[in-house]
Swiss-Prot record:
It comes from Bos taurus (Bovine). It comes from the Eukaryota. This is Transmembrane protein 213. It is a single-pass type I membrane protein. Keywords: Glycoprotein, Membrane, Signal, Transmembrane, Transmembrane helix. The lineage of its organism: Eukaryota, Metazoa, Chordata, Craniata, Vertebrata. The chain crosses the membrane at residues 72-92. PANTHER family: TRANSMEMBRANE PROTEIN 213. The keyword Nucleus does not apply.
């Protein structure tokens, strides 16, 4: 039963350990991308109409990143998992501390 009292501290330490790895993943994701920091916007739509045979999709895929990358989804999943694990462990800790003498329904 002694291990259950350490459960909130264990989840806190694990959460901090996972958070310390998050900047490493962000650095790898930003260094591995081939995107440039300059953004080129056409002055008007006539510029695109001047090049009817050019496929802009590969360049747009290289330069325009939309949504969350794979590291962002992993970090979000780990964060939510740790939150729910902490809540579950806190509830288990409360249930373990509940004695038969105490009333479950406390008067307000």
């Amino acid at each position: 039963m002694k291990r259950l009292h350490l459960a909130p501290w264990t989840s806190l330490v694990l959460g901090l350990a996972f958070l310390s790895f998050h900047p490493v993943y962000l650095a790898e994701a930003s260094s591995g991308s081939n995107s440039t920091s300059t953004v080129h916007h056409p002055e008007n739509l006539e510029t695109l109409e001047q090049c009817p045979n050019v496929d802009f999709c590969p360049q747009a895929a290289r330069c325009c990143h939309t949504g969350v990358d794979e590291y962002g989804w992993i970090a979000a999943a780990v964060g939510w998992s740790l939150l729910f694990l902490t809540l579950i462990l806190l509830c288990v800790d409360k249930l373990m501390k509940l004695t038969p003498d105490e009333s479950k329904d406390l008067q307000a």
